[in-house]
Amino acid sequence: MEVVAEGVETPDCLAWLRQAGCDTVQGFLFARPMPAAAFVGFVNQWRNTTMNANEPSTSCCVCCKEIPLDAAFTPEGAEYVEHFCGLECYQRFQARASTATETSVKPDACDSPPSG
């Protein structure tokens, strides 16, 4: 049986569900409610990103700009970012975290170059 959890809002909740054996999750941690007209574009962005994750022309920011910084550093978040966008994108999150720590400001993931 496949288990789906709805209403996942925090990285802690996501970690608990993963430990409990939950197969799939959805919730505000990944996307907020949106108008129907915006949904088509949202789905197309995800589909294109998933299909083109290894192409250099695909911007990591297409799929992960909505991921909160703290969510990107959970085991699940890291796995998600690396799966859909690759290691370079995860390195952008690391650079973003470093910048946020140094300045106490959370810049957009797109603003920071990959580290390394």
Swiss-Prot record:
Record PROSITE patterns: EAL (PS50883)
Domain EAL: 1-47
Single Gene Ontology MF annotation: cyclic-guanylate-specific phosphodiesterase activity
Annotated keywords: Activator, Repressor, Transcription, Transcription regulation, Transposable element
InterPro entries according to UniProt: Cyclic-di-GMP_PDE-like (IPR050706), EAL_dom (IPR001633), EAL_sf (IPR035919), TnpM (IPR021767)
Signal sequence coordinates: none
Alphabetical list of Pfam families matching this protein: DUF3330 (PF11809), EAL (PF00563)
Protein's UniProt keywords contain Signal: no
Entry function: This protein enhances the Tn21 transposition by activating expression of the transposase gene and decreases the resolution of the cointegrated DNA by suppressing expression of the resolvase gene.
The protein, known as: Transposon Tn21 modulator protein
Organism encoding this protein: Escherichia coli
